[in-house]
Amino acid sequence: MPKEYSRSQRVVEQIRRELAELIRLEVKDPRVGFITLTDVEISPDYAHAKVFFTSMTGEESVPEILQGLRRASGFLRRELGRRVRIHTTPELHFHYDRSVEEGSRLSRLIDDAVREDEIRHRDDDN
């Protein structure tokens, strides 16, 4: 059975897709070229949207990326208003998403612990 999505979930997903396309194709600022939009959260009145992103260039470039995104936010909001039919086009607030890096860090810690455990068990067997 297909999953039911609320209107706000559909709007959030459409906003994420449209912003990703606009950033990729329309924003000429090189500071925002290598980002991926990971999530969008929208306020109940649609007045504000938190847009979460990750960067292929790493966390050290986040301040520059945020500066570029903030500079382009008026353009992005205007274009979003033309593409997404909602009563209020949200004000965009960009946030760096650390969850991907945190997930990688935790995965490495788990791998290290498993490796150490295997070595310890190998030594115990000998």
Curated annotation (Swiss-Prot):
It comes from the Bacteria. Keywords: Cytoplasm, Ribosome biogenesis. InterPro entries: KH_dom-like_a/b, RbfA, RbfA_dom_sf. Its main location: cytoplasm. One of its GO terms (biological process) is maturation of SSU-rRNA. One of several proteins that assist in the late maturation steps of the functional core of the 30S ribosomal subunit. Associates with free 30S ribosomal subunits (but not with 30S subunits that are part of 70S ribosomes or polysomes). Required for efficient processing of 16S rRNA. May interact with the 5'-terminal helix region of 16S rRNA. Monomer. Binds 30S ribosomal subunits, but not 50S ribosomal subunits or 70S ribosomes. PANTHER family: RIBOSOME-BINDING FACTOR A, CHLOROPLASTIC-RELATED (PTHR33515:SF1). Belongs to the RbfA family. This is Ribosome-binding factor A. The lineage of its organism: Bacteria, Pseudomonadati, Pseudomonadota, Betaproteobacteria, Rhodocyclales.
